[in-house]
Amino acid sequence: MDILNELEWRGAINQVTDEEGLRKLTSEDKIALYCGTDPTGDSLHIGHLIPFMILKRFQLAGHHPVIIIGGGTGAIGDPSGRKSERQLQTMDQVHHNEEALTAQMKKLFGTENFTIVNNYEWLSKISLLDFLRDYGKLFNINTMLNKEVVASRLDAGISFTEFTYQILQSVDFLHLYRHNDVQLQIGGSDQWGNITAGIDLIHKVEGPDTKVYGLTIPLMLKADGTKFGKTAGGAIWLDPEKTSPYEFYQFWINQDDRDVIKYLKYFTFLSKEEIDDLAEKVEKEPWKREAQRRLAQEVTKFVHGQEAVEEAERISKALFSGDVADLSVAEIEQGFKNMPSVDVENKKENIIIWLTDNGIEPSRRQARQDVSSGAIRINGEKVDDVDAEIDPQAHFAGKFVIVRKGKKHYYLARVK
């Protein structure tokens, strides 16, 4: 399938500057294309996957993706999608974030047929006088003010620093065209003004017939109208230390039936036939949640690898069944990260006293009732003897005791 046809089918195209010209170019030749990300944090999140999935599809089709780490622009701050001025980072913060993001991108794209560059390398060499003379003269203030990214900030105010961001991004496109043969820039729908500004700059400097293009991606909204990627608990990070692979897997498996097929098209490499088959299953047997499971498997595999998928599914199965005894210490750390936890002494104790003194049961009467009725499981085993003894050293290398009350309520006791 033609790459643009595939992107259209997957719902990944919002606007293209010259679709006919881009279609002709990509059908006749392999091109270099790019998108940029500023190092505002030390990890990518799932929002970054939106443009990166486009780059990855081009890469798999034989084209050459380039990613700019905005070491220069990141020190300035992109006003796109912002209602207020960004807080400037220190250069030490910027450099730390650059290193972390670079490592994550290499994991997603590999090292073959892929380039990472840092715009600090060329932007830092432009003096103020050169900037004003060589580039400032080529930008019309009226045109810049009419760009949505600037116009939306005029009432609240925008600093000259952020106002010049689109010039810097345009310089990036020109630099990559000259030095990396880049002919296409990819960005979110809020980047349209910055992308077209870059194309205009290239046409002014290199000639009006220069073949450069821009493509933006639709704003990703959930069926309820809220923005994709935002959760009550905050961002879903690609760094496994910030969002564990289990949490990452759970995010995807919990998607709404109304959204899951759209996400399968966008965030996986499954074929049209495979996705159509899953769409039919959502229609006929939604309670099986096969589409959600496949979505979670595919995206987790892409970001964290197959081993992380298997680990996440082991944790999920154990928590559902209550059979937690075979989980590793690392799996317990992941699976119980957001569950109630208590710190307990490393000593043997009667179960009734232990449950009550550690706040898992509100009273000894309630503890006796729950234990004698079989509602309490310790490390996966039912305990119905009120005279039983808890030994914190018995399982999980003496680090944890897992308590389950009823069918759904878990507590993680961390042994001091």
Swiss-Prot record:
InterPro entries reported in the protein's UniProt record: aa-tRNA-synth_I_CS, aa-tRNA-synth_Ic, Rossmann-like_a/b/a_fold, S4_RNA-bd, S4_RNA-bd_sf, SYY-like_C, Tyr-tRNA-ligase, Tyr-tRNA-ligase_bac-type
List of residues binding ATP: K230
GO molecular function: ATP binding; RNA binding; tyrosine-tRNA ligase activity
Motif ('KMSKS' region): 227-231
Key words, A-Z: Aminoacyl-tRNA synthetase, ATP-binding, Cytoplasm, Ligase, Nucleotide-binding, Protein biosynthesis, RNA-binding
GO CC list: cytosol
EC number: 6.1.1.1
Class of the enzyme per the UniProt entry, highest EC level: ligase
PROSITE patterns named in the record: AA_TRNA_LIGASE_I, S4
Subcellular location per the Swiss-Prot or TrEMBL entry: Cytoplasm
Binding site for L-tyrosine: Y34, Y165, Q169
Residues spanned by motif 'HIGH' region: 39-48
Highest taxon above the source species: Bacteria
One GO-annotated biological process of the protein: tyrosyl-tRNA aminoacylation
Catalytic reactions on record: tRNA(Tyr) + L-tyrosine + ATP = L-tyrosyl-tRNA(Tyr) + AMP + diphosphate + H(+)
Predominant location category: cytoplasm
Annotated ranges, domain S4 RNA-binding: 349-416
Subunit structure: Homodimer.
Family that this chain belongs to: Belongs to the class-I aminoacyl-tRNA synthetase family. TyrS type 1 subfamily.
Chain's role: Catalyzes the attachment of tyrosine to tRNA(Tyr) in a two-step reaction: tyrosine is first activated by ATP to form Tyr-AMP and then transferred to the acceptor end of tRNA(Tyr).
Protein name: Tyrosine--tRNA ligase
